[in-house]
Amino acid sequence: MTRILAWHFLPEDRRLRYDDGREVKAGESLSVDVTPVLCERGMHASPRIIDALSFRTGPVLCRVRVSGDVVRGGDKVAGRTRECLWMVDAAPALRMFAVDCRARQIATYRRRGVRIDPRADAAIAAAYGYLAGTVTLAEVRAAADATHAAAAA
């Protein structure tokens, strides 16, 4: 039997979508009695975590094992059964990843000679500060507003 180790995101309530509603629990398996078809039916997941981000329905990250008539696609798999090995609220990590991505994007533009308004750096610094607990949400919003104003000018 094919068993694929993969990643899957859940909403905060940790329940399946699409009128199923079953709660996902670490250490337990959930199954469906259908022939898996990618993007249509079955228990889906992504072998690479970066791909799982594209299908994210919420902040709860699960390490899963998919089995049972497994169908493979480029960025996902589907099977009859998905076993949740463990789960974690990944919201803080997802926020940090988003800020890191934006900071890397700005650095890439600078290396290519694009002039970046300093208010963009202030917004990134404010976002990092917010994640560290040293900056308020109001301060982050003010920095973001300044960046948007600079872009519009």
PLM ranges: what are they?
Residues 1-153:
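Short, glycine-biased loop/turn motifs at secondary-structure junctions and
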